[in-house]
């Protein structure tokens, strides 16, 4: 490696906010199933605290050795609805508390997997878990929850969509931070290292390490050097920069898996912003020539960014996975916040952007008097985009305050301006229930 590459890497870390966003250990809990929920909770606690005992120490050790910040150490587990279904319990809050206790014991930032997969209907544990979510998130600190309500192969479970509109409202009423730890998915992936949507899929190995990187500031700085040049040059610049960022993620993942003695899973090729100035996906899009994010051309700029990040990242890694694309959470990106505040970015434009990027309507504050059916309809719209386009989409929405208020979450979750929501009713649409069938192009066999 020549000296130019060394100084380039140092600048990425010191000046451009490059970091490894997360090392996430996925742990299967299938061997913790027990008909007695308290025994199951104890088995869960024991397995997590045994398998992930050294996760934080190893993460800190690698960060110090390489001089690269590793912001979060996290754990994801088998969807808890599968574990709880073996019991006769009428709620799974005790399992959420076991996860929380284990997370605190090992020192991780979050633990994901208080989850249910209901894209084609409810099994015994699913409805119990979904109804447990508001209390589970109110009575724990580190637990994250997700529900998959649709897939390209199965269509959209509209009964579950309606239920999740209600659950989001109940969660917001019970706690300030609960809704920030709850995601509703279509086409959820089994190897996602990012919260709040991470869970450990049943097809994964017993224990694995997945890595998520962050580097929008690095991409922006690279694009500053090619101002005014053609999109061919822009695309090549993003691709080469993504390769460098992702290569470091690959190295960190390999080191962590070797030292922890577990399999290395994937690097997630996502560009994840933070509220810090200089760490914004929105500012990358503006660097391409937009006056502000939300104006015409935003979706095209995002398409270029998303695709070139994948092209550069794929060559840098043995295995890629997770969500892999650009994240556009409003509260976690100072450029997105500014665009909402100046009126150039609204919910409808955000929805268009989600047809391109990873995830969907993420960390968006809406008025607290928004009906549950309207929230459910937002989920249905996002699910439709994901199901038809064969990609992951999601909703993490915060019904708090009144339009124009600023909702403060703190830390990586940032600050969200409360956005205007279309006031026309979707009640009759959502109350139908049932299943929206899978699209014709999903029928491949």
Curated annotation (Swiss-Prot):
Top-level taxon of origin: Bacteria
| Gene3D superfamilies per the UniProt record, alphabetical | 3.20.70.20
**Which Pfam families does the UniProt entry name for this protein?**
DUF711 (PF05167)
Question: According to the UniProt record, which cysteines are disulfide-bonded?
Answer: none
* InterPro entries linked to this entry: UPF0210
Using the record, list the residue span of the signal peptide; answer none if the entry has no such feature: none
Quaternary structure and partners: Homodimer.
Q: Which family does it belong to?
A: Belongs to the UPF0210 family.
Q: What name appears for this protein in its UniProt entry?
A: UPF0210 protein spr0218
């Amino acid at each position: 490696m020549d000296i130019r590459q060394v100084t380039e890497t140092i600048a990425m870390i010191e000046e451009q906010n490059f970091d490894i966003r997360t090392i996430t250990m996925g742990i299967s809990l299938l061997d913790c199933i027990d008909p007695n929920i308290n025994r199951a909770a104890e088995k869960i606690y024991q397995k997590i605290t045994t398998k992930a005992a050294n996760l934080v120490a190893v993460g800190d050790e690698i960060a110090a050795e390489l001089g690269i910040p590793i912001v979060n150490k996290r754990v994801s587990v088998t969807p808890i609805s599968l574990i709880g279904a073996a019991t006769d319990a009428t709620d799974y809050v005790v399992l959420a508390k076991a996860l929380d206790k284990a997370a605190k014991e090992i020192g991780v930032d979050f633990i994901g997997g208080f989850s249910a997969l209901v894209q084609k209907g409810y099994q015994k544990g699913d409805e119990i878990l979904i109804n447990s979510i508001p209390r589970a998130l109110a009575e724990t600190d580190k637990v994250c929850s997700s529900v998959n309500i649709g897939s390209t192969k199965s269509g959209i479970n509209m009964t579950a969509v309606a239920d999740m509109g209600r659950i989001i409202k109940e969660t917001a009423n019970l706690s300030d931070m609960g809704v920030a730890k709850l995601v509703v998915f279509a086409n959820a992936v089994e190897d996602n290292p990012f919260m709040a949507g991470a869970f450990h899929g049943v097809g994964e190995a017993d224990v694995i390490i997945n890595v998520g990187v962050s580097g929008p500031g690095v991409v922006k700085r690279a694009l500053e050097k090619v101002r005014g040049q053609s999109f061919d040059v822009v695309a090549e610049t993003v691709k080469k920069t993504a390769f460098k960022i992702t290569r470091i993620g690959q190295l960190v993942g390999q080191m962590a898996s070797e030292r922890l003695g577990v399999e290395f899973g994937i690097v997630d090729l996502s560009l994840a912003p933070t509220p810090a100035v200089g760490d914004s996906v929105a500012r990358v899009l503006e660097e391409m020539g937009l006056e502000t994010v939300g104006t015409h051309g935003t979706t095209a700029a995002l398409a270029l960014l998303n695709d070139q990040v994948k092209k550069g990242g794929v060559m840098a890694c043995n295995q890629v996975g997770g969500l892999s694309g650009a994240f556009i959470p409003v509260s976690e990106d100072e450029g997105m916040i500014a665009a909402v505040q100046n009126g150039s970015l609204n919910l409808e434009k955000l929805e268009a952007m989600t047809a391109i990027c990873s995830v969907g309507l993420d960390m968006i504050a809406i008025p607290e008097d928004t009906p549950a059916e309207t929230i459910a309809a937002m989920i249905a719209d996002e699910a439709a985009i994901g199901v038809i386009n064969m990609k992951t989409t999601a909703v993490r929405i915060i019904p708090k305050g009144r339009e124009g208020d600023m909702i403060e979450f703190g830390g990586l979750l940032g600050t969200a301006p409360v956005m205007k929501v279309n006031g026309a009713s979707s009640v009759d649409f959502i109350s139908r229930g049932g299943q929206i069938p899978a699209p014709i192009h999903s029928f491949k066999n």
